């Protein structure tokens, strides 16, 4: 009997996460899904500076390898490289470049069976699927999506109306009861856009859980798509 092919999943990092840091943060999940899913991590295209130190000092990007630079998918102010998920933004600066980057990754690194997004990456993953469902040829619909600490992106212009339509693909939504960065009601609102959404809550905060209870839920969800 032929071995089961691992599912391939493109994973979109959160705001202020480096590619290497996101790989490390998903290490427990990668171990939990070993042999069942291959996780390919992608961080945003835009470098995010560290907050100023006590004397206004910032870290030196020039001494930091690209894969270790904190990055983001878009900023919510025109002049400052900052992002707030919970406030109506003045702009979504850099979003189009990020959509282009995801499209390139899907084309260059794919095919993928599913998408996984964490925090800002979850909001972007949902938007990518909404655009694909609306007919954007850059974004073929995946077979499934996993959204961890997700939220509905605000202030994205005409794209916001696209996200208000039901998204017809299997989805698993994971969020913590004590998440102070993305409150659970934000993730619940995003899940409501997916008919038949499965929700998985945990007692922790803003991270990707991979303990035994979550591992079983992930495997049960992913086994629907095994070949």
UniProtKB/Swiss-Prot annotation:
Pfam family, one: FSH1
GO BP term, pick one: response to retinoic acid
Reactions this protein catalyses: a carboxylic ester + H2O = an alcohol + a carboxylate + H(+)
Gene Ontology CC: one annotated term: cytoplasm
UniProt entry keywords in alphabetical sequence: Hydrolase, Serine esterase
PTM statement from Swiss-Prot or TrEMBL: Proteolytically degraded in response to RA and 4HPR treatment in a time- and dose-dependent manner in the promyelocytic leukemia cell line HL-60.
EC numbers: 3.1.1.1
Main EC class the enzyme belongs to: hydrolase
Gene Ontology MF, one: hydrolase activity
The protein's role, per its UniProt record: Exhibits ester hydrolase activity with a strong preference for long-chain alkyl ester substrates and high selectivity against a variety of short, branched, and substituted esters. Is able to hydrolyze ester bonds within a wide range of p-nitrophenyl derivatives (C2-C14) in vitro, with a strong preference toward substrates of >8 carbons.
The protein's name: Esterase OVCA2
